[in-house]
């Protein structure tokens, strides 16, 4: 949602040094896990959405952020993906699962499968590659409304 990637939201490590404790996280290029892993390679994609969808998406993210202590990282669901199974837990997400959930709640049309993986976002209608390379070297130019980072 932030073309400068100063605010990125997802479900991942709560502590950059401990991969086993996860939940809702707010990160940036120089904050959190990406600060620790300075050589992270990334691809930033965008899709066009309406102002109304953008506002809904913002509301959804901020609602989850305000109640983040109620949410957990869906470790079981993430492991299940590797086994081609879907295990959905209440108030628990892995990264791609959260993006799909937020898009659905914001009424952003998508063709994502039930068992969603980061590479599935490449099949979104009208997706556009904005940047590929080292995250620390990312510089914003003119990006559309919604960025799906780190696919």
Predicted regions: what they are:
Residues 8-13, 57, 61, 100:
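Generic hydrophobic/packing signal
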Residues 30, 35-39, 48-78:
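A structural motif
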Residues 1-47, 78-87:
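Glycine-rich catalytic cores of cysteine/serine-nucleophile enzymes that process amide/ester linkages
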Residues 46-49, 131:
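Surface-exposed beta-strand edges and flanking loops
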Residues 67, 71-151:
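Activation targets extended, charge/polar-rich intrinsically disordered C-terminal tails
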Residues 4, 15-18, 30, 39, ...:
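Detector for Asparagine
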């Amino acid at each position: 949602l932030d073309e400068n990637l100063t605010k990125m939201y997802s479900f991942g490590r709560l502590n950059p040094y401990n991969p086993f404790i996860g939940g809702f996280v707010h990160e940036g290029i120089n904050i959190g896990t990406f600060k620790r892993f300075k050589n992270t390679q990334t691809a930033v994609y965008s899709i066009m959405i309406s102002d109304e969808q953008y506002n809904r998406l913002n509301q959804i993210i901020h609602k989850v952020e305000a109640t983040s202590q109620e949410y957990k990282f869906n470790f079981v669901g993430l492991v299940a993906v590797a086994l081609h199974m879907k295990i959905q837990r209440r108030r628990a997400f892995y990264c791609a699962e959260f993006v799909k959930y937020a898009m659905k709640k914001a009424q952003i049309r998508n063709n994502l499968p039930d068992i969603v993986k980061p590479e599935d976002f490449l099949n979104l209608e009208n997706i556009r590659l904005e940047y590929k390379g080292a995250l620390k070297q990312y510089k914003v130019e003119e990006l559309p409304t919604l960025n799906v980072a780190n696919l």
